[in-house]
A protein has these predicted regions:
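ATP-dependent helicase/translocase motor core
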Residues: 1-66, 70-172
Length: 172
């Protein structure tokens, strides 16, 4: 019986590659929250954190979308609510659920759910994000793509976005 990992490896990744995503842009099995601490008596344990099957990055520091993959025999939409929840936590605008055959997209900018034949290209997704976030000025869009300064550990002061280790934070 196939597993979710089989679906990811044999069905989802080839579709991402076909859409032009590269290994550098595809982050697999990303834990983006620490697990909840549960106290029982005098002992405290940490549960597992939330883990996205895939995060799609436009650049190293700019995550555009989350994908929740389900095993092949489930419906493509079975993981959509989970993907939407993850996208909201991460401040992302695009959530996808797939069983490797069908793909369901939820656009958090428009609130629309769409069934797709394939994943959008990185450029198409970035273009849609720019349009949805009203980033018409190329200079402003470039500032959003400016990476964290790893030497100083600071974000450039003229950058309009905040950075978190797992993905993009919501604008403040």
């Amino acid at each position: 019986m196939p597993t979710e990992a089989d679906t990811c490896r044999t069905l989802v990744l080839p579709k991402l590659y076909a859409a032009g995503w590269t290994d550098e842009q595809i982050a697999e099995q990303c834990t983006f929250t620490a697990g909840r601490i549960v106290v029982q008596g005098t002992k405290a344990t940490r549960r597992k954190g939330k883990r996205a099957d895939y995060l799609l990055r436009y650049t190293r520091d700019k995550v555009l979308a989350v994908i929740e993959a389900k095993v092949e025999y489930k419906k493509p939409a079975d993981g959509l609510q989970q993907a939407i929840d993850y996208a909201q936590i991460l401040g992302l605008k695009f959530a996808y659920s797939t069983n490797g055959h069908g793909i369901i997209e939820f656009d958090l900018i428009t609130g629309k759910e769409t069934e797709l034949d394939g994943f959008p290209t990185p450029a198409a997704l970035w273009s849609r994000l720019r349009a949805g976030e009203n980033l018409k000025d190329d200079a402003q869009a470039e500032r959003i793509l400016t990476p964290l300064n790893l030497t100083t550990g600071k974000i450039p002061m003229n950058s309009p976005r905040a950075w978190t280790g797992g993905a993009n934070a919501k604008k403040t």
